[in-house]
Structure formats: C-alpha cells, structure tokens
C-alpha cells in the first residue's frame, strides 16, 4: 500500500499546490492537516515509559520539566488581547490537575511555576488532596515583593528550589549590581531551598560567573527563533564552561518552533533539562519526543548534569 504524506494528502484533498502549502507558517499547515486527517485526534495513547532523569542537588529531576506559564494565564501571544483570559478559562482547577496527572503518568516528575497565591493553592491541593508527587521548582514572582520572603512562602507550600526571575537578574547585571543577585540567592539557601539564577541574556550568566556567584543551577533561555534569547550558538559555547546544571526554557520560543526540533536543539546546545509549558493534549507526545531522542543519544559537547 502506498503511503501518502500528510502534505500530499492536503494537496490531493484541498487542491493546494506544494508551493502555496510550503509558504504557510507551521501552525497553519498543522491546522490544515487536522482538517483532513484527524485519526489521532482525541486518541488515548499508552503512557511513555522510561523518561530519563538527571540530578539537581540531591533531587532526581526528569529531563523534561512541565512549565507553568500556561496555567498562570500567559502564553506569550504578544498583542493578542484575549490570550490571558483564554488561558485562565481553559486552565480551571480540574484542567490543571488533569494536566499535572498526565505529566506524572508519562514520567515527568517536576514542574516549574511561579511563587504566587494561585500556584500555592493549586499545588498544595494537588499534593495533599490528590496524591500528586510532582516536585516544584519555583520562579520568584516580582509582584510578591521581597524575593527572599517570596522564597519562604514557596518553601512553606512545598517547593524544593527557587530561582530569581530572569528579568530581575538581567536588570541587576545591566546595572552592575551582580552582588545583589548573590545576596538574594544566599537568602534562598538560608530559607532551605536550592537557589537558581534566571537569565534571558547570556551577558547575565557571564556577569554572574565573573562575579563568582555560586548558584545551584541556572535557568537560561535558548531557542532557534531568537525569542527572548541571546544567539543560541553563543549561549551553547559559553555554557560549555559553566559547571552548574542549567535548565533551558523558552526552548520553543513560546510555541513558535516545532517540538522535536526545538527540544533537540536545546539539548545539543548543552541544556541539562528543558522546561516546557504544555497543554494536556501535548504532554504525552512531547514526553515521547524527549524520551526517544535521549535514548538514541544527543550529539553535544557538554557533559550531562
């Protein structure tokens, strides 16, 4: 039996020329594909087994971490005025719990989310009332005030680690105040948490390394589409010299790149873990991509944490 590609099926079914189809953005091509081939839509798939893990301090962390921007109402949809309302309506309490449960079923054992009341309440209910086991790495929430006090609240609600928000770190380094970052991460540790530094700019990591700050880990943006990130080649080259574990985030440019290619790229550039915001219907396939590519082996120069 001759196999017809999805692109070929589109051309035959909709009468679209290859040239026109090739000119469409990935999102539009994916949408058109669903119009003529919905064989996978809503299908229940077997959970992924054997998702790989690494170490962050004394904790075993899945190489794929489920992010929290979507459940906090942020999809980085730029000028779309309705996106926050759409996200918060979609991710009601039950949908949040369903998504976290799917993550656990597929081997993801860690989530990365803001340290704010919305997350405090949901995470505590999930772990205490629903039996959830996800570990939580917190992101400091600037609007909550002093980051060290924010860390203490995150700790009290179950976080194992916290990192300083990337925009805050970026600004401190730009202003020549890297020592302020050092003071804050020292406070994080005194609160009993692993302490990380977030960065959207490579210069932030470079400034922290030059100042000989000693975080437990870095959070660094890296992607193929230059979205809130320094050039990926430069990030990858510098991070070879950084001994601390680092978590890549915005690895798909907030949904602007394809999962398989974006994940592979981040790992090849040296990320030890990737944090990815996922809808419930993306969890299983994203996990399968990561498990398969790591099982096959990733071509990278940097040793794994």
Task: Describe each region flagged by the PLM.
Residues 1-17:
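N-terminal secretory signal peptides and thylakoid transit peptides that target proteins
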Residues 142-145, 167-305:
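Beta/alpha (TIM)-barrel catalytic core signal, keyed to glycine-rich beta->alpha loops juxtaposed to Asp/Glu
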Residues 93, 100-124, 128-174:
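Active-site beta->alpha loop and helix N-cap motifs at the rims of alpha/beta catalytic domains
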Residues 47-63, 148-156, 205-210:
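Short amphipathic alpha-helices and their capping/turn segments at secondary-structure boundaries
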Residues 24-62, 298-299:
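C-terminal segment of N-terminal export signals and the immediately downstream linker at the start
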Residues 60-84:
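N-terminal small/glycine-rich loop or linker at the start of catalytic domains
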Residues 65, 111-112, 163, 219, ...:
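Conserved beta-strand positions in the central sheet of alpha/beta enzyme cores
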Residues 77-93, 136-145, 173, 252-257:
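Active-site mouth loops of central-metabolism enzymes
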């Amino acid at each position: 039996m001759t196999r017809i590609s999805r692109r070929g099926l589109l051309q035959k079914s909709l009468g679209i020329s290859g040239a026109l189809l090739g000119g469409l953005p990935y999102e539009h091509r994916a949408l058109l594909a669903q119009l003529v081939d919905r064989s996978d839509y809503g299908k229940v798939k077997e959970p992924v087994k054997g998702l790989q893990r690494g170490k962050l301090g004394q904790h075993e962390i899945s190489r794929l971490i489920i992010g929290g921007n979507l459940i906090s109402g942020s999809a980085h949809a730029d000028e779309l005025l309705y996106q926050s309302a759409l996200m918060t309506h979609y991710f009601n309490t039950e949908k949040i719990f369903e998504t976290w449960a799917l993550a656990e079923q597929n081997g993801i054992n860690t989530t990365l989310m803001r340290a704010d009341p919305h997350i405090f309440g949901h995470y505590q209910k999930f772990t205490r009332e629903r039996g959830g086991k996800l570990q939580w790495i917190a992101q400091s929430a600037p609007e909550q005030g002093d980051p060290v006090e924010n860390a203490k609240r995150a700790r009290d609600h179950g976080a194992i680690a916290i990192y300083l928000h990337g925009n805050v770190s970026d600004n401190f380094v730009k202003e020549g105040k890297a020592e302020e970052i050092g003071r804050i991460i020292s406070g994080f540790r005194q609160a009993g948490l692993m302490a990380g530094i977030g960065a959207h700019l490579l210069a932030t990591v470079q400034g922290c390394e030059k100042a000989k700050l000693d975080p437990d880990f870095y959070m660094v943006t890296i992607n193929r589409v230059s979205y809130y990130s320094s050039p990926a080649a430069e990030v990858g080259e510098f991070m070879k010299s950084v001994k601390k574990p680092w978590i890549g985030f915005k690895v798909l440019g907030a949904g602007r790149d394809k999962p398989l290619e974006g994940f592979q790229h981040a790992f090849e550039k040296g990320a030890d873990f990737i944090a990815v915001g996922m809808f419930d219907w993306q969890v299983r396939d994203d996990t399968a991509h990561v498990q398969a590519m790591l099982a096959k082996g990733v071509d990278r120069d940097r040793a794994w944490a």
